[in-house]
């Protein structure tokens, strides 16, 4: 069963909540007004480290189990510590538009072949039922060869999920890790007047 985080109603300012060890936030949805909430700092940070900052989450508010998607994680400009979170409450069957991250695995295999991955796109915008949308897309690039590329159209996330990015957009290209500037001609200083 997925971890359920406890949210509590917040009546104080965000700064006060942070001093008490909470991360303040707001929850909103199709049939609800925005509501100020708090999450216990340590538990929310552990959840975000494990699931990511653009994931679905199960939480409890006033004894009621709810599901939401993380829309934004606010960070302090100097320390980059988390200072706020915005959550859109959704039902499993509700259609939502959401940005999900792309993760790459298999970089070690590429390195053994003296190849590396040039990443051009790290997330895609999708729409579908909340229950059908994955928290992320993981691409295994370990078996790809020099010059091969992955495009948005190559993603396999289900026919019931609409992707808003251009299908021909390049996600990543496999390149050589060797120096590609072999034939750089140096200017002869004696030719300069």
UniProtKB/Swiss-Prot annotation:
Oligomeric and partner information: Part of the 50S ribosomal subunit; part of the 5S rRNA/L5/L18/L25 subcomplex. Contacts the 5S rRNA. Binds to the 5S rRNA independently of L5 and L18.
GO molecular function: 5S rRNA binding; structural constituent of ribosome
Species of the source: Clostridium tetani (strain Massachusetts / E88)
Signal peptide: none
Function: This is one of the proteins that binds to the 5S RNA in the ribosome where it forms part of the central protuberance.
CDD domains (alphabetical): Ribosomal_L25_TL5_CTC (cd00495)
Family the UniProt entry places it in: Belongs to the bacterial ribosomal protein bL25 family. CTC subfamily.
Annotated keywords: Ribonucleoprotein, Ribosomal protein, RNA-binding, rRNA-binding
Descriptive protein name: Large ribosomal subunit protein bL25
A cellular-component GO term for this protein: cytosolic large ribosomal subunit
Lineage: superkingdom: Bacteria
Biological process according to GO: translation
